[in-house]
Amino acid sequence: MEFLERTYLVNDKAAKMYAFTLESVELQQKPVNKDQCPRERPEELESGGMYHCHSGSKPTEKGANEYAYAKWKLCSASAICFIFMIAEVVGGHIAGSLAVVTDAAHLLIDLTSFLLSLFSLWLSSKPPSKRLTFGWHRAEILGALLSILCIWVVTGVLVYLACERLLYPDYQIQATVMIIVSSCAVAANIVLTVVLHQRCLGHNHKEVQANASVRAAFVHALGDLFQSISVLISALIIYFKPEYKIADPICTFIFSILVLASTITILKDFSILLMEGVPKSLNYSGVKELILAVDGVLSVHSLHIWSLTMNQVILSAHVATAASRDSQVVRREIAKALSKSFTMHSLTIQMESPVDQDPDCLFCEDPCD
């Protein structure tokens, strides 16, 4: 099929491929299977109008695996969190320790955030609609941001309770029970952080960015681990020096500072993503130089790089080619080069001739540093 505009889009969606044009508003939609997209038949790539890079595996399978992997992590974390939350509530009540109870309260918030992340993860798997053409992918980001907000609210409540204990120190703490419960909490949170930790290398040793929901959950678990360690330290202090029971509310203050600090980085990354910023894993100049290095490319403008989620990068660009080179061949080479060097969710390349370039056009200017 021929298109009026030489525009190209690669889109990895679950079980479907989409090809769009600028002027014909025509949509090709067909399932991806082994007969249509074999890996060992490169001649079809030359004859067909679409180059679809699978990077060694089908994008549909990759997306399904990522979804199942994230779901498994969040479900496992929820189960662990629920069990030890109940244990800490009972143990904290018996010990009379605010630090243990606050740790249990934070586990409750973690459990809520894990369930919220599971819901947003399910929502992000829903297919696109005519109104939401990119689908519900960013529901995952909104869920993660809401989870961070919950952390801040609970942290504020715990700081308030700690202040009350500093002002009214008429309370008793059973240090032995506190040590036992806090030791179990440390072990539980170590298991949680191991389960939720997801740094790995993708194809061609490219680092795959973390799923946003799992990343937010990991921050929760990391904050819990710091809290549990500080509770254990304060329990040991109170056990050997009962007159230093002020360590209990001080532990809560330390925990609050650590947790708030741990949310700043992830909040910054999510803010850049929502502002359509270039992903941290990519360099704008590096991507442009890679395109310019392709034989036949004269210039690149209107280059835009952004993300749907932490691991779904989208790129679009206008490329001017030499008249002596077949623009469709150049387009395929650009797509191959980009897909080989970076993990791309979507790639749109509009091929143009040098006469189409306008040096005075504001939209064609390179962005400022």
Swiss-Prot record:
Residues binding Zn(2+) 1: H106, D110, H220, D224
Q: Which GO terms describe its biological process?
A: insulin processing; insulin secretion; intracellular zinc ion homeostasis; positive regulation of insulin secretion; regulation of vesicle-mediated transport; response to glucose; response to interleukin-1; response to type II interferon
Please report, in chain numbering, the residue ranges of the motif HCH Motif.
52-54
Q: Which residues bind Zn(2+) 3?
A: H52, H54, C361, C364
Query: Where is region (Disordered) located?
Result: 31-52
- What InterPro entries does its record include? Cation_efflux, Cation_efflux_CTD_sf, Cation_efflux_TMD_sf, CDF/SLC30A
Q: Which domain of life is it from?
A: Eukaryota
Q: Which residues lie on this side of the membrane: Cytoplasmic?
A: 1-79, 125-140, 197-217, 267-369
Q: Which residues cross the membrane?
A: 80-100, 104-124, 141-161, 176-196, 218-238, 246-266
Q: What is this protein called?
A: Proton-coupled zinc antiporter SLC30A8
